[in-house]
Amino acid sequence: ALPAAAAALAGAGFVHRRVASLGQPGGIEMFLDGPGASPRDAVHVLLAGEKVRPDSPLPTPDVTEAEPADGFLLLGLEALVAMKLAAFRDKDRTHLRDLLELGLVDESWLGRVPQAVRGRLEELLRNPE
């Protein structure tokens, strides 16, 4: 899967890099928007159905959880929320708070997210800050 993605992205001018990450065996795969681009602005690639870290409570969503959107596939909101809850880094919590503030996620979601990450959503609902 990764070689095919690398070839497709290289054709669009992206440069493949693997960078080290704490707790991530083998590092993180990313594609920079040209040779001088920063990893902060890169496209980060996660393979479907695999755990990002060995201790992650859930694997990444399967490709079947994507929805058609104007000529491409877009990860569905439920799958995105579960992925953000599984990663639960500061930036993921920030994205989840944004979804809460916009009303796209609320208490009714407690029954929609996997049990393995439900406590994390409860934590954000109790204390969004």
Give the role of each language-model region.
Residues A1-E129:
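Compositionally biased terminal segments of proteins
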